[in-house]
Amino acid sequence: MIKEKANALGKAAGGKAVLSYEVTMNRPTLFSVILKAEGDRTVYGGLNLDVSGGKALEDQDLLYTNSAEYAKYLQGKEYVFAENGIRVASAPEGPLDTMVPYTQLVKAINVAEGARLLTSYKLDSAAEDMTLDLKPGELVALYMEANPTSGNQWVLVDQSSQPGFANLGHSFTLPLLNPTGQAGSPGVTILFASFTQPGDYQVKAVYAKTMAAPLRERVFKFKVR
């Protein structure tokens, strides 16, 4: 795929094009590279490759393409993943010289695959009495035992007083076996979050029915710097 892209750029550049490249990300399952062809003119191209699948990444593999952040920064543009953000082409076939930090894109990151791209932390109730040090843009997954058939669900309490906090949604997993013998559907709710700016954060999650007093609550502390 890289060779095909390089050959296409060489033809687009014209003349006796000279090819060069810059690797912007090299992870076990993700490889991104910028190719440059200098001939009668200079043209650029980018590739994002799924190393484990041996194919080019589709936008929706790592991103929510229906998000406002995707539409604002990435839609219709050529881009590659880098360590601190996404490098975007300023013009068709032009240099990928615009850096969009991940802190501006956290709501566009597909949290199910986010660990391939960003540092991610998995926390459970044992983390309540601790303060976790993070960097802006890193992901947090809070694992909470839940049984939605009881009518209760875990939700994050309003964090509008902490403008750097980003609520990235939730998911629920149901184990194949039920070792506890509980009635209903005991499983784990996963609450996803990130932080876009430095600061000290206190995040509260409550387990409750709608419009009812919480049955349980947990507080997690984070120092982002």
Task: Label each residue range with its predicted role.
Residues 197-201:
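Short tyrosine-centred short linear motifs in exposed loops/low-complexity segments
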Residues 162-170:
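Short aromatic-acidic-glycine turn motif
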Residues 144:
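C-terminal active-site-capping segments
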Residues 1-139, 149-150, 172-195, 206, ...:
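Compositionally biased intrinsically disordered regions enriched in Thr/Gly
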Residues 152-162:
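Short Gly/aromatic-enriched secondary-structure transition segments
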